[in-house]
Amino acid sequence: MAEESTTGGFAAEVIDVIGNTGMHGEASQIQCRVLEGRDKGRVITRNCVGPVRIGDILMLLETSREAKKLTTR
């Protein structure tokens, strides 16, 4: 497994906020670029809860899992 930083996660920078998801729109779907670890430089799609904007740094516990793409009904 790749080395983790002292906080127990992998740093990722938010590069795009795609939209809201969840039953009541409480989660945001974002694209982020992994800054360290095995998947360094990879752009992944994740769901996150709470306020987030472009340029924020998130700590991801794992970088291999991606969120499903948003669809409209």
From Swiss-Prot:
GO terms for biological process: maturation of SSU-rRNA; ribosomal small subunit assembly; translation. Belongs to the eukaryotic ribosomal protein eS28 family. Keywords: Ribonucleoprotein, Ribosomal protein. This is Small ribosomal subunit protein eS28. GO terms for cellular component: cytosolic small ribosomal subunit. It comes from the Archaea. GO terms for molecular function: structural constituent of ribosome.
